[in-house]
């Protein structure tokens, strides 16, 4: 029977997730199974028994610690997965309460639930969720969490209640998780799969000293039983918790109406990786507590709250092989070849593994079932192996000793480097084609007609010997290629377009020329800084390491890489060829533009209507300012457009003046005296 098989499968995964802290499928795959079971029971209500996995909260408590009853049940949350389902939930709520409600929008932390009980302000018990009625006592371990006070603070406006039961989420910050994994892999142990499971296992250590070393954190997000105080709203409850010294999220917002809720959901869907911990959705709650009581709850979840789950960014798949790629600077990078799997709306079959040390740190073997993540446009990443799924047939990856493209012996550039490189920079076929393709990239010369296949064809046909020959290409040499030649032997339309693109690219600004040279560590930010400081390729070439390092935004590592690059004869030959072909090597300062931002550091975050990202940076640089990438106390202004990231919040925290786009335009035209700090409304 389908229901029986599905229920047993869900129960097994619940056991692995909640009790063993060792799941073998992703959260998204589990959600899909549970949803299928719920839909089956919706069609056949007689199947919905009290012990069905759809009716239980969590997977039951583990037996390692003393069972303890919660004062009030710890309910779970129902989930929605798209805006239509969210609107349908809100419609059901507002049919009962009336329209135009205030909702609280909270980030949904991907952690483990914890219940704290305070009597007369002192912590007396901490317990895991368990089955919602009975959990396990982890008081000693909870006391090691920095965010959990042993005694509540006097609340001023909010007197400390006689009895307080508060719920929250225990989690690991991503940086702490990475540090923990690095440490245990160095000891020869397999890495942990993800922060959530690691937090759960850390909370249930028998030795509290082990828990203390794990650097767990906590955010409070709800109340159980409370005596001596009744909050009028969820928002007020959070103010009270904060006054008592309990941690609450700084990302919670109170909004009116479901449209505003959907805006918050969309915002955090785009910015979920701007937070120090993992989130997997938004929790939306009716704010007014009297309405919460009216709406009530089902056997497992409140009707006044819902979890909007973002599309899964993690999945499990089979690691078929580990191969290596040679990049434009000679770096040899292992990458994973996997059975294709759909994540975040796209099919993923390959992911970088960075270097041999990273393969070892992650503990992955060829043949493993692995967990992979793809966050929006971010390159897919292998998180680690599902150790419980191993069969014994897996094998270790061995890094090659010679370049797979040219056969040159591989070696680290200097002792202690994690990366190994092919030293045959000048003629290694892989490095050549990657450099030619890089010249055409959007951050360099932005040559639309020169794609990856074109780069390969130009080199293989002999039309060019290296990137130095690009700007001297003519019709005769293009006719030696297959890609740019028609069947009748004439130049194709794409060939003509390539020649036009190359001619136009000769007049690109100096910073783009610098990026196109493939100097290690020199991306658009450093290139802009060098071009603004020195103004010509000749002056950059002649500058000392100290002079280069003194450039704001460059520093010693980039300076050394630039100076070293210009000591190589064939590198200088590329510059000479480009110069001879008419590529502009000097930035002529437009004297008509006033230096209104001389010495000021400006950060732009979010999308502006009248400026592209590069356009905003160039406008700042042209006026003598620095287009910085991060906010600090030295930042003069932060310009905030649509959908700003964490930089806006950082500016608020540091008291840095915030401008909208209109203020930015005035700042460019008239300087800092003409603008006042403008803080956009948060939603």
From Swiss-Prot:
<protein>
    <recommendedName>
        <fullName>DNA ligase 2</fullName>
        <ecNumber>6.5.1.2</ecNumber>
    </recommendedName>
</protein>
<keyword id="KW-0436">Ligase</keyword>
<comment type="similarity">
    <text>Belongs to the NAD-dependent DNA ligase family. LigA subfamily.</text>
</comment>
<dbReference type="GO" id="GO:0005829">
    <property type="term" value="C:cytosol"/>
</dbReference>
<dbReference type="InterPro" id="IPR001357">
    <property type="entry name" value="BRCT_dom"/>
</dbReference>
<dbReference type="InterPro" id="IPR001679">
    <property type="entry name" value="DNA_ligase"/>
</dbReference>
<dbReference type="InterPro" id="IPR018239">
    <property type="entry name" value="DNA_ligase_AS"/>
</dbReference>
<feature type="binding site">
    <location>
        <position position="309"/>
    </location>
    <ligand>
        <name>NAD(+)</name>
    </ligand>
</feature>
<dbReference type="InterPro" id="IPR010994">
    <property type="entry name" value="RuvA_2-like"/>
</dbReference>
<keyword id="KW-0234">DNA repair</keyword>
<feature type="binding site">
    <location>
        <position position="106"/>
    </location>
    <ligand>
        <name>NAD(+)</name>
    </ligand>
</feature>
<dbReference type="Pfam" id="PF00533">
    <property type="entry name" value="BRCT"/>
</dbReference>
<dbReference type="GO" id="GO:0006260">
    <property type="term" value="P:DNA replication"/>
</dbReference>
<dbReference type="InterPro" id="IPR004150">
    <property type="entry name" value="NAD_DNA_ligase_OB"/>
</dbReference>
<keyword id="KW-0460">Magnesium</keyword>
<dbReference type="InterPro" id="IPR013839">
    <property type="entry name" value="DNAligase_adenylation"/>
</dbReference>
<dbReference type="GO" id="GO:0046872">
    <property type="term" value="F:metal ion binding"/>
</dbReference>
<dbReference type="InterPro" id="IPR033136">
    <property type="entry name" value="DNA_ligase_CS"/>
</dbReference>
<feature type="binding site">
    <location>
        <begin position="27"/>
        <end position="31"/>
    </location>
    <ligand>
        <name>NAD(+)</name>
    </ligand>
</feature>
<comment type="function">
    <text>DNA ligase that catalyzes the formation of phosphodiester linkages between 5'-phosphoryl and 3'-hydroxyl groups in double-stranded DNA using NAD as a coenzyme and as the energy source for the reaction. It is essential for DNA replication and repair of damaged DNA.</text>
</comment>
<dbReference type="Pfam" id="PF22745">
    <property type="entry name" value="Nlig-Ia"/>
</dbReference>
<feature type="binding site">
    <location>
        <begin position="76"/>
        <end position="77"/>
    </location>
    <ligand>
        <name>NAD(+)</name>
    </ligand>
</feature>
<dbReference type="Pfam" id="PF03119">
    <property type="entry name" value="DNA_ligase_ZBD"/>
</dbReference>
<dbReference type="GO" id="GO:0006281">
    <property type="term" value="P:DNA repair"/>
</dbReference>
<feature type="binding site">
    <location>
        <position position="403"/>
    </location>
    <ligand>
        <name>Zn(2+)</name>
    </ligand>
</feature>
<feature type="binding site">
    <location>
        <position position="406"/>
    </location>
    <ligand>
        <name>Zn(2+)</name>
    </ligand>
</feature>
<keyword id="KW-0520">NAD</keyword>
<feature type="binding site">
    <location>
        <position position="428"/>
    </location>
    <ligand>
        <name>Zn(2+)</name>
    </ligand>
</feature>
<feature type="binding site">
    <location>
        <position position="422"/>
    </location>
    <ligand>
        <name>Zn(2+)</name>
    </ligand>
</feature>
<dbReference type="InterPro" id="IPR036420">
    <property type="entry name" value="BRCT_dom_sf"/>
</dbReference>
<feature type="binding site">
    <location>
        <position position="129"/>
    </location>
    <ligand>
        <name>NAD(+)</name>
    </ligand>
</feature>
<dbReference type="GO" id="GO:0003911">
    <property type="term" value="F:DNA ligase (NAD+) activity"/>
</dbReference>
<dbReference type="InterPro" id="IPR012340">
    <property type="entry name" value="NA-bd_OB-fold"/>
</dbReference>
<dbReference type="InterPro" id="IPR013840">
    <property type="entry name" value="DNAligase_N"/>
</dbReference>
<dbReference type="Pfam" id="PF01653">
    <property type="entry name" value="DNA_ligase_aden"/>
</dbReference>
<dbReference type="Pfam" id="PF03120">
    <property type="entry name" value="DNA_ligase_OB"/>
</dbReference>
<feature type="binding site">
    <location>
        <position position="285"/>
    </location>
    <ligand>
        <name>NAD(+)</name>
    </ligand>
</feature>
<keyword id="KW-0479">Metal-binding</keyword>
<keyword id="KW-0464">Manganese</keyword>
<feature type="active site" description="N6-AMP-lysine intermediate">
    <location>
        <position position="108"/>
    </location>
</feature>
<dbReference type="InterPro" id="IPR041663">
    <property type="entry name" value="DisA/LigA_HHH"/>
</dbReference>
<dbReference type="InterPro" id="IPR004149">
    <property type="entry name" value="Znf_DNAligase_C4"/>
</dbReference>
């Amino acid at each position: 029977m389908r229901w029986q098989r599905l229920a047993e499968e869900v129960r097994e995964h619940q056991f692995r997730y909640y009790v063993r802290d060792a799941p073998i499928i992703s959260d998204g795959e589990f959600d899909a199974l549970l949803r299928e079971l719920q839909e089956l029971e919706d069609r056949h209500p007689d199947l919905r028994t009290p012990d069905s996995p759809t009716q239980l909260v969590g997977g039951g408590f583990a037996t390692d610690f003393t069972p303890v009853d919660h004062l009030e049940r710890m309910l779970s949350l129902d989930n929605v997965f798209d805006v239509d389902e969210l609107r349908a939930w809100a419609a059901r709520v507002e049919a009962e309460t009336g329209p135009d409600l205030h909702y609280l929008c909270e980030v949904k932390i991907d952690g483990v639930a914890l219940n704290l009980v305070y009597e007369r302000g002192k912590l007396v018990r901490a317990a895991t969720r368990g089955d919602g009625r009975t959990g396990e006592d982890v008081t000693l371990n909870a006391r090691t969490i920095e965010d959990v006070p042993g005694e509540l603070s006097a609340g001023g406006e909010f007197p400390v209640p006689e009895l307080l039961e508060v719920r929250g989420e225990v989690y690991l910050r991503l940086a702490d998780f990475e540090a923990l994994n690095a440490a245990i892999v160095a000891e020869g142990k397999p890495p942990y799969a993800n922060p959530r499971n690691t937090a759960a296992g850390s909370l249930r250590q028998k030795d509290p000293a082990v828990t203390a070393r794990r650097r767990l954190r906590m955010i409070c997000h709800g109340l159980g039983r409370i005596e001596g105080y009744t909050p009028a709203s969820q928002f007020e409850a959070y103010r009270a918790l904060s006054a008592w010294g309990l941690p609450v999220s700084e990302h919670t917002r109170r909004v009116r109406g479901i449209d505003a809720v959907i805006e918050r959901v969309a915002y955090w869907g785009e910015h979920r990786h701007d937070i120090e911990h993992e989130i997997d959705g938004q929790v939306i709650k009716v704010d007014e507590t009297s309405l919460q009581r009216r709406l009530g709850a089902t056997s497992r979840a409140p009707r006044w709250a819902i979890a909007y789950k973002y599309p899964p960014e993690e999945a499990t798949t089979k690691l078929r092989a580990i191969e290596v790629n040679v990049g434009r600077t000679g770096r040899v990078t292992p990458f994973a070849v996997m059975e294709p799997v759909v994540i975040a709306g796209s099919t993923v079959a390959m992911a970088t593994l960075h270097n041999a040390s990273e393969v070892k740190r992650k503990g992955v073997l060829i043949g493993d079932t692995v967990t992979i993540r793809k966050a929006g446009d971010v390159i897919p990443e292998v998180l680690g192996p599902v150790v419980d799924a191993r069969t014994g047939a897996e094998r270790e990856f061995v890094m090659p000793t010679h370049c797979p493209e040219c056969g040159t012996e591989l070696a680290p550039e200097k002792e202690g480097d994690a990366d190994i490189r092919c030293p045959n920079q000048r003629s290694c076929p892989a490095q050549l084609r990657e450099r030619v393709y890089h010249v055409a990239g959007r951050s360099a010369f932005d040559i639309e007609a020169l794609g990856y296949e074109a780069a390969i064809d130009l080199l293989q046909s002999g039309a060019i010997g290296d990137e130095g020959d690009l700007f001297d290409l003519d019709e005769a040499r293009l006719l030696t290629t297959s890609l740019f030649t028609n069947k009748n032997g004439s130049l194709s339309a794409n060939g003509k377009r390539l020649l036009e693109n190359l001619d136009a690219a000769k007049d690109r600004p100096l910073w783009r020329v610098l990026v196109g040279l493939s100097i290690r560590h020199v991306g658009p930010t450093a290139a802009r800084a060098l071009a603004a400081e020195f103004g010509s390729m000749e002056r950059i070439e002649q500058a000392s390491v100290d002079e280069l390092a003194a450039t704001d935004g460059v520093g010693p590592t980039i300076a050394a890489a630039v100076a070293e690059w210009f000591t190589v004869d064939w590198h200088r030959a590329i510059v000479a060829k480009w110069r001879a072909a008419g590529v502009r090597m000097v930035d002529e300062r437009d004297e008509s533009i006033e230096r209104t931002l001389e010495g000021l550091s400006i950060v732009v975050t979010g999308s502006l209507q009248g400026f592209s990202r590069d356009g905003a940076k160039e406008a700042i640089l042209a006026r003598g300012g620095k287009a910085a990438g991060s906010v600090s106390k030295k930042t003069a202004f932060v310009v905030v457009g649509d959908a700003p990231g964490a930089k806006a919040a950082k500016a608020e925290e540091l008291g840095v003046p915030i401008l909208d786009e209109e203020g930015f335009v005035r700042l460019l035209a008239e300087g800092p005296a003409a603008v006042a700090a403008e803080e956009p409304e948060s939603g």
